[in-house]
Every structure is written in structure tokens, then in C-alpha cells.
Amino acid sequence: MIAEDQRCVRCGSRSVRPRTGKGRTRPYRVFAALPVPDDCLIPACRRCGAQYLDDETIAALGPVLERVYVAELQRLAALYIRRLPRRLISQRRLELLLGLSQGYLSRLAAGDGVPSAQLVLLLGHLADGAPESIENLKNFWRRQLSQTEPEQKEKDQ
């Protein structure tokens, strides 16, 4: 027996049932709009497109969105590593400044490994703000060691 379509609370039509679709997104972790694979079933209204996520759908979407999330972090990390200007800083020097193991950025650039969202954010910031952001990074730890606590408080105000 085929389940009857449910009524849509937005438009009132009786056309809500699990559907596949293109171009759907969901907020997930740090991403405001992570793409949902086209073949995922999400209860939606055929007429107005309203989506209805119940506990079962959310549980099924979790592992799917996690895979998409990891793939997107890997893609962005590789992109930002390629955009970093080598004339300003070598990958090895950057690994040392960021406290990363030797060769980690090369692995990420090749699509291996799973970078943290924080590392992807930092790589994106460095790539977008080069060369100023790279110079700030080079001097960051030196500045921290030379500052006393009152100087830090004055800078915060």
C-alpha cells in the first residue's frame, strides 16, 4: 500500500511526500548552505517546495551531509593551499608557523587527509589577504613573546 501524501502547512495542498531534487541545500556545521545530494529523499511539497524534516529524515541525512562536509573541506583546503604565493612563504615554513606536521599541507593539497574547519578558515584568510596576512603570520609569535600583559590590555581597548 502506498502512503497517502501529507498536507502542506504552507500552501495547503496535499502533496507532501519524500522526494529527490536538484539544488537543495541545508545548513550544516560551519556552512550556511551545504549542497544536499540530488538522490537524497526529503519530504517536500510538490506544489510550493516546502521541506519537512522529521527525526527519521534528519538521522538519515546526518551521515550524507558529513561526507559532503568533509569533501568540501578537502576541496577548499586544496584550493587555498594552491593560491598561497610560494614566493612569500614555503609550505614547510607555513607548516612550522601553524604547528602542523611536515608534509601535511602537501597531503591536503593532494586531496588526502581531513582538514579541520579552523585550518581551512586560516588558509582561506592567508590566501585572500596575501601578502599582508602572511607577513602578520610570520611576526605573530615574535610579537606575542615580547608583549607584557598591560600592553595587551591597552591594545584590546
What residue ranges belong to the model's regions?
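Short alpha-helical DNA-recognition segment
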Residues: 88-106
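N-terminal cysteine/histidine-rich coordination modules
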Residues: 1-67
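A short, Lys/Arg-rich alpha-helix, primarily the initiator
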Residues: 58-86
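Generic structural marker for isolated residues within well-ordered, non-membrane alpha-helices
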Residues: 81, 91, 120
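Helix-turn-helix/homeodomain-like alpha-helical modules used for DNA recognition
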Residues: 14, 139-157
